[in-house]
């Protein structure tokens, strides 16, 4: 979910909204939770960290986005990892309900994450599960499937068939367990579809097909999704959610999305309010600044008043998006730079070549001992940790924690590691700032990328509901 790669394509705009001038554009009434607390869960989490559906703190969420499905070269809806999605048997110790899958049972047709998601929903009936299509590597064929009325209709129909009706591919000769898949096997798993097209109309460097016609075709694609989801929902007796993930900053100024029309079509918009900065920049800065520090070096081509979480919200509201359609994104990961001099404790300084892992997760920082998660001051119902050192969020093992009051963003700096190591990240304090913004501006809620990146205690997820 990178937005920085599109920076060269940004076009400056002349509209910069102030908080006092925010319009509340009328939007289509939407269903689903009015106070969204969402997180993404990926089908590769089982490999990357051994993080399973059973570990998701569903009691702290009301929406779970599953990443990713994707459009295929054939113009249909596809799964990006069928083994993880619906084939991999789950043992009793890893199952949500403690019951193992039976790969020898010819009557069991659903395994993997999909089966565990059904069990998660049974245990937490308020949680809606939404399949996200696309992402950075899965957006290649969006331009093609959105190009004509016929291609849009066929693609959306295949998504309804695969994801909502649950008609999964099956072939005992090539799929194991041989009973996996088939008609209706995944019925009831998903309560909606999320579109993460990165990005219509431009070449962000991810190999995605693109055309100037994408900008309007993306709107038409969402409208076709809305039409078919509503039609199928009427027959099924429920409302299926439709959401879209849209970029931060002024990337939309001359369009990669028609904001007001999209707002009226979807239930809500997930704002990609992160990756404002990273190792692609010539200097260190914050991955997800809450607001703009005036000392932040300008990004070429960017309207800097939009280059923060609060600035992005202002921009969307000024361009016709209703507040109740905006869900603010929170990254559960940071950005790391090395070869950073000690001036200003590493902030806004030049850096060396990117490290092998330039996006450490909050789990990496806390559970491996670089940052302390004992935070006690975010409010009367604060996140409180007693198992760590008790030093209220300070850096550990050579790192010191600093805080930029203008950007409302923390960072870690170690002057001796790798010639000076700077890590921008989000902690529960920063999540609480975003929760207050949501309440202040009457926005729809918060969402996180992604749940397995949280620390073992789930501190960031808990902070999504901070006072």
Per-region residue spans from a language model:
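Solvent-exposed loop/turn segments at secondary-structure junctions
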Residues: 43-47, 68-73, 135-140, 197-204, ...
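Glycan-binding loop/region signatures in secreted carbohydrate-active enzymes
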Residues: 72-101, 277-298, 330-437
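Aromatic- and acid-rich polysaccharide-binding/catalytic face
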Residues: 60-62, 66-73, 81, 186, ...
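Substrate-binding cleft/loops of secretory-pathway carbohydrate-active enzymes
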Residues: 48-51, 243-283, 334-351
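Secretory targeting and sorting signals
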Residues: 1-24
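Active-site cleft segment of glycoside hydrolase catalytic domains centered on the general acid/base Glu
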Residues: 140-262, 280
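Conserved, mostly hydrophobic/aromatic
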Residues: 64, 131, 195, 225, ...
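Glycan-recognition patch characteristic of GH18 chitinases/ENGases
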Residues: 31-177, 213, 307, 357, ...
């Amino acid at each position: 979910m990178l937005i920085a790669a599109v920076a060269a394509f940004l076009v400056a705009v002349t509209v910069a909204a102030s908080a006092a001038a925010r319009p509340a554009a009328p939007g289509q009434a939407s269903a689903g939770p009015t106070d969204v607390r969402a997180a993404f869960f990926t089908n590769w989490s089982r490999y990357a960290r051994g993080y399973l559906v059973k570990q998701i703190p569903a009691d702290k969420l009301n929406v779970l986005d599953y990443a990713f499905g994707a459009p295929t070269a054939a113009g249909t809806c596809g799964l990006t990892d069928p083994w993880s999605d619906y084939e991999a048997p789950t043992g009793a110790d890893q199952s949500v309900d403690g019951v193992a899958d039976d790969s020898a049972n010819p009557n069991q047709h659903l395994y993997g994450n999909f089966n565990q998601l059904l069990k998660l929903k049974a245990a937490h009936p308020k949680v809606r599960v939404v399949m996200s299509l696309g992402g950075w590597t899965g957006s290649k064929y969006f331009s093609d499937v959105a190009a004509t009325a016929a291609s849009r209709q066929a693609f959306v129909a295949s998504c309804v068939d695969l994801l909502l009706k649950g008609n999964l591919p099956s072939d005992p000769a090539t799929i194991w367990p041989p009973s996996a898949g088939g008609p209706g096997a995944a019925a009831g798993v998903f309560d909606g579809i999320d579109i993460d097209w990165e990005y219509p109309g431009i070449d962000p460097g991810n190999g995605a097909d693109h055309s100037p016609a994408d900008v309007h075709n993306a709107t038409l694609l969402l409208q076709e999704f809305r039409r078919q989801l509503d039609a199928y929902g009427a027959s099924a007796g429920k409302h299926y959610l439709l959401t879209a993930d849209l970029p931060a900053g002024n990337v939309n100024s001359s369009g990669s999305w028609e904001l007001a029309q999209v707002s009226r079509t979807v239930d809500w918009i997930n704002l990609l309010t992160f990756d404002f900065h990273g190792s692609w920049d010539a200097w260190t800065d914050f991955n997800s600044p809450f607001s703009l520090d005036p000392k932040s070096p300008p990004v070429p081509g960017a309207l800097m008043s939009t280059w923060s979480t609060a600035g992005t919200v202002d921009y969307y509201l000024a361009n016709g998006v209703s507040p109740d359609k905006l869900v603010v994104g929170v990254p559960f990961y940071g950005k790391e730079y090395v070869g950073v001099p000690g001036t200003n404790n590493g902030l806004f300084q030049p850096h060396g070549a990117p490290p092998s892992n330039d996006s450490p997760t909050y789990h990496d920082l806390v559970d491996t001992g670089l940052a302390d998660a004992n935070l006690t001051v975010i409010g009367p119902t604060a996140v409180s940790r007693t198992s760590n050192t008790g030093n209220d969020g300070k850096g550990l093992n050579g790192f010191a924690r600093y805080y930029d009051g203008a950007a409302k963003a923390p960072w870690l700096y170690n002057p001796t590691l790798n010639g000076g190591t700077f890590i921008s990240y989000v902690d529960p304090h920063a999540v609480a700032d975003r929760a207050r913004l949501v309440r202040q501006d009457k926005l729809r809620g918060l969402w996180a990328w992604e749940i397995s990146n949280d620390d073992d205690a789930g501190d960031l997820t808990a902070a999504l509901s901070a006072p």
